[in-house]
Every structure is written in C-alpha cells, then in structure tokens.
Amino acid sequence: MAKFDLTAKNCQYLDRHLTFPLLEFLLQKKVFDQTSLLKFILETVSKTNMVDYKHDIRERLAMDKVHPDELAQGRANVLATLKELQAEVAPLMKCMEELKNPDSTKDSKSVIHALQQTLDYDIILSAQKLAKYLYECGNYNDSLSYLYVCMLVMEPNDKNYLGVLWGKLAVEILTLNWQTALEDLTRLRDFIENYNFSPIQVLQQRAWLIHWSVLVFFNHGKGRDLIIDMFLYKPQYLNAIQTMCPHILRYLATAVIINRGRRNALKDLIKVIQQESYTYRDPITEFLEHLYVNFDFEGARKKLHECQTVIVNDFFIIGCLTEFVENARLMIFETFCRIHQCITIGMLADKLNMKPDEAECWIVNLIRNARLDAKIDSKLGHVVMGTQPLSPYQQLVEKIDSLSVRSEALTLLVERKHKAKTQEAGEGHWKYY
C-alpha cells in the first residue's frame, strides 16, 4: 500500500543510521521496486564508514564485485583513522579508568570537576569526534562509551553538548536500550525547551525529537501513555506536529486506539484530526472520523480493513496490529451500542467484519472479563446493553486534562512575551548530513 507509506517523510527527520532498519523493513515488504530501494540504501550507506554493509548492498544489487584488495584497503583506512583518534583521547580515557578503579579514594564528582578544569578542550572535542566516527562505522556500543565520557566532562552550555545528547539517544535506540533511550529522550527534550534557540530552530528540533520519540514510545512499556501526553497535551509539540509533520497523527491516533485507559483523549484527538484533515489523512485517522464524527459504521468497518494493511506495512506500529484490531472493534461496538440498546448478533458481526459465531464468542469474552455491561439472549440472538454512565472519577480526569492543556498554553504565551531576543544557536543536532 505505497499510497499510505510514510517512510520517505519519516526519514527526513531521522539520522541515516536510524533509517536503515526502516529501509530494510521496506525491502522485506516488497512495497517498492527492490532495485531502486537498494540503490537508495547504497547511496545512504556510502556516506558512512560502514564498509562491509556497503559491500553487502553492492552484492545484493549484483554490481561489479569489489576487489578484495580494495575492500581490505577501505577497512585499513577506517582502522588507521580510529587509531589516530584513540591516541588523541588517551589522556582522557586514562583519567576515566581511574574513576572505575574501586580502590581509588577520589570522589567521582571531584575527579570530573578536575577534568573539566584541567583537560585541554581539544581532547574533549577529539572524544566527541571519535564517538561520531565509531558511530559512522556502525560500532554503536563503543561509540556509546565515548559519548558518555563527553556528557560527563562537557558543560551543558558547550556548543557541542546538544550534539552529544542527540548522538547518545541515537545509539540507545539502535542498541534497543529502551529504558535508557526514554531517559535520554526526556533529557534532550528538557534541554531543547531551555536552550536559547530561535523560533524556527526550536520548531525544527521539536520535529526531529517527535520522530525519534515514536521509535522509543512504541517499544517502551509506558510509551503509549507518554506519546499521548507529549504529542496531544504539550501545546508546543502539538503545534510542531500541526506545522511541520501532520503525518505523525497516524501514530498518535494508533496510541489512543490501543490504549483503553486513555479513551478520554479521543475527543481532543478527533478535534485535531478534523483541523488537519485538509493536510493529512489516512485510513487510521479516517476510521476515527467515520466512527465518531459521521457515525458511519459501514465506512468505519471498511476503513478498519484498510488500517490493517497500513499497519502491517508501517515499521513503527506493525507490532500493534492485534491490539489495534481488537480495540478498534471494541470502539465500533461501544459506539454502536450507545445508539442501539438492543442489537442482533448478526448486525454486530457485519459491523465488526466477523462471522456471527465469532462475534458472539467475542462479546461473551468481553462480558466475562467485566469489560462490558450487557446480556446475550441466545434464543433471539440479541445483545441487550446495560447503562454505562461516565464515572465521577473519569469526569474529573477529563476536566483536569482540559485545564492542564489550557494552563500550559497560557504559560507558554507568557514566557514567549517576556523572553529576550533570542541569539542564533550553533549547530542544533547530532549532525549527519
């Protein structure tokens, strides 16, 4: 379903190393021409130091084989540069080894402070350069070690500190360390919000962070709540989505659909989807519009079928397919039941894209698991709904969420009016291109 593929849009906001898993995923799905895609990967990997990966892509393209001597020379050049950079940072690493020594009587904070005061700044820059070089070689774990050192000895007001934060987040994502990635994501977000960027720069930084965070949120246990809190209820990030990347609404909508505990976010989400429908729409956003705006159950049923195809071909959310279908069916069912108190199982089966016996079994399981206040009349083949008033607690939660959004928007407005004229910031992120 190439029409709804977001890989090209998403890759604009991702580091080239983060794009490789997405591009390899597309190759497996065979959505696009394989040769064209492999050529694009080759063009991208050629900008890195990943000699073996480049050689592998050339072989998959059945291009002229690289001479073994040429391949060996490429590896030798990379290793030679690595040795030079490692020699430059040797004094720094010797000090860091002292910190690791359990017999050392020195306090780690005092050692780090001493390093900041006495180390030649060029050595710290060399450590960052080495971390970046290792990263470009695809040696992410070793890169992480040097990035960690840079974070310890660099002052937050250093012009290169932000680049280190971006690099650390990239490495944690690529090594699938989701808990640490979430911590780095929070640290980076706080830094971006407090740094003296120009308005256009901070908008760009937020757009990059939004895309990187999708990778983290859909792989972390708490991510489904956090993505809603950040994308929908932080006005500055919602504004960035609406301004720079409305296609991110697909992932926000998916998070709300699979998160039964956040149904109170539906009203706000649908409002945003309607506002942005002229710039972006896909089967997932249209499913919600059909169901909650138009009450078009037939349209929602058809869109749910399309949603499954979209999700299966989307690297970010393919792992949510089963949950998505289950919760989407439940949403159709709940909405239909608000309108009709007594429904035939055959009618429900049609709306849910299920066979009658499957639909009856599905409803029985809902009732059994205390997720539904209803009774089944097997003789007549009817489902009779009970009353489902909104609990006082849920009403309170909705009001608090609404007040929280208004308060944050007002705070941002006040800060913007009192903020001094911003200075042009240096390089904004872990620069790859």
Swiss-Prot record:
It is found in: Cytoplasm. InterPro entries: eIF3e, eIF3e_N, PCI_dom, WH_DNA-bd_sf. It holds the Pfam family PCI. GO terms for molecular function: translation initiation factor activity. Disulfide bonds: none annotated. Residues 217-390 form the PCI domain. Its main location: cytoplasm. GO terms for cellular component: eukaryotic 43S preinitiation complex; eukaryotic 48S preinitiation complex; eukaryotic translation initiation factor 3 complex; eukaryotic translation initiation factor 3 complex, eIF3e; nucleus. The keyword Protein biosynthesis applies. GO terms for biological process: formation of cytoplasmic translation initiation complex; translational initiation. Keywords: Cytoplasm, Initiation factor, Protein biosynthesis. Component of the eukaryotic translation initiation factor 3 (eIF-3) complex, which is involved in protein synthesis of a specialized repertoire of mRNAs and, together with other initiation factors, stimulates binding of mRNA and methionyl-tRNAi to the 40S ribosome. The eIF-3 complex specifically targets and initiates translation of a subset of mRNAs involved in cell proliferation. Component of the eukaryotic translation initiation factor 3 (eIF-3) complex. Belongs to the eIF-3 subunit E family. This is Eukaryotic translation initiation factor 3 subunit E. The lineage of its organism: Eukaryota, Metazoa, Ecdysozoa, Arthropoda, Hexapoda. The gene is eIF3-S6.
